[in-house]
């Protein structure tokens, strides 16, 4: 990670939809500095960067990953690209925060974890529903064989 113990981590966001805005705000509230944004459309990314106060727009994920000053990449893109993007981010030796769902199948999820472990970076998936009572009940049902 590029951030020293005295500096906040630098973050880039992949995704310009509603959840991208949430990730920008959450990163800032956690003390990170949001330095860049990439989206599926350069025009939309520029408009969102201006609205969200993000200083740099990258043309694509590859350009973002070439930046040595980015410590963490938040993936807030469409679900079907989470796995390929998270693996690319980990391979670039940047930490990954991935919106749910982590992946569309268990093999892809395993590949994401393997890539992060091989690169020595953190991979986290946002899943705040795990604290909901209904999720605890479903988990208990699964463990008991009821599901």
Each predicted region: which residue ranges?
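N-terminal Rossmann-like dinucleotide-binding module
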Residues: 1-52
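A broad helix-preferring feature
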Residues: 15-24, 65-73, 119-121
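Short alpha-helical
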Residues: 18, 43-44, 80-83, 104, ...
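Aromatic/hydrophobic pocket-lining residues that form π-stacking "cages" and hydrophobic walls in ligand
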Residues: 23, 45, 85, 112, ...
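Structured helix-beta-strand junction loops
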Residues: 30, 92, 118-119
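Structural detector of well-ordered beta-strand residues that form the stable sheet scaffold
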Residues: 35, 58, 97, 122-124
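A contiguous active-site-proximal alpha/beta segment in oxidoreductase catalytic domains
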Residues: 103-147
């Amino acid at each position: 990670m590029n951030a020293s113990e005295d500096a906040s981590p630098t973050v880039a966001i992949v995704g310009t939809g509603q959840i991208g805005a949430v990730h920008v705000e959450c990163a800032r509230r956690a003390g990170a500095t949001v330095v860049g944004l990439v989206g599926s459309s350069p025009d939309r990314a520029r408009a969102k960067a201006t609205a969200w106060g993000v200083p740099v727009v990258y043309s694509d994920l590859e350009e973002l990953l070439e930046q040595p000053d980015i410590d963490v990449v938040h993936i807030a893109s469409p679900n079907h690209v989470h796995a390929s993007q998270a693996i690319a981010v980990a391979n670039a030796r940047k930490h990954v925060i991935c919106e749910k769902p982590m992946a569309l199948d268990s093999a892809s999820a395993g590949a994401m974890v393997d890539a992060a472990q091989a690169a020595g970076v953190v991979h986290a998936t946002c899943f705040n529903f795990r604290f909901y009572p209904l999720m605890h009940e479903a988990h208990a049902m699964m463990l008991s064989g009821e599901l």
